[in-house]
C-alpha cells in the first residue's frame, strides 16, 4: 500500500467563492426595493380634527411641526430622471 500525499488544494478551491461572513445570521441578499405605486395617493387622509387631537402622554418636541402628508405629496410628485449621456 503506497500512501499518496494529502493535498488540501481541492478543499481550498471549493471554498474560494464563499464571501466572508456568508454563514453569519442575516447574511443573505438585501431586501428588494418596492416600486412606488400611485395607490399610496388614494389612501384615506386623516381629517383636520384627527390631526389636532393630542396623543396622551406625548411630549412637545422642540422645533416646528411638520405635516407628513405634505411631504408625501411632494415626494410622490418627484420623478427619477436618468442622467443624459454627454
Curated annotation (Swiss-Prot):
Xref: InterPro entries: Chisel (IPR029268)
UniProt-annotated stretches for the region Disordered: 20-64
A Pfam cross-reference name: Chisel
Domain of life: Eukaryota
GO CC annotation terms, alphabetical: costamere; M band; muscle tendon junction
Organs and tissues of expression: High level of expression found in the heart and skeletal muscle, a very low expression in the lung and spleen and no expression found in the liver, kidney, fat and brain.
Function: Plays a role in the regulatory network through which muscle cells coordinate their structural and functional states during growth, adaptation, and repair.
Family designation: Belongs to the SMPX family.
UniProt-recorded name of the protein: Small muscular protein
Organism: Sus scrofa
